[in-house]
Amino acid sequence: MIKGSCACGTVRFEIEAARSMTYCHCVNCRKLTAASVATYVHVDKDKFRWLGGEDNINSYESSPGSFRKFCRTCGSMVPGQAPYLPTVSIPAGLFDDDPGVRPRLHVFTSSKAPWHEITDDLPQHPKWVPWFGAEVAGVAYSR
């Protein structure tokens, strides 16, 4: 099992295995993470388990149907799951150990921070990934 937590350690979780990792450059993710790019690990729902602190989580609807979750104590963004996706999205920096996956692609590159240069050879998508429809266009996800 691979464990993770928020900065203060109140919200804790573990996963059996990660499915993928994505770099998201959308404005929402940049503002919510206070970084030029957000990195998410995606895990199948049945491979994710809360270990503690669920009662210490606040939610914010960052776009219609997309709820971001934060630790009430330290403010760290914590794992969240959109009802229309089969996975839980976890900010990669929350893991205590290597989640065992590496980034596979960039999404929303059309809104990337002007000071951020993409220097790798991973696929870049100006908006959303081609294999998902517009109904989930506001959520960072890769398969």
Predicted feature residues:
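A short Gly-Trp-Pro
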Residues: 1-143
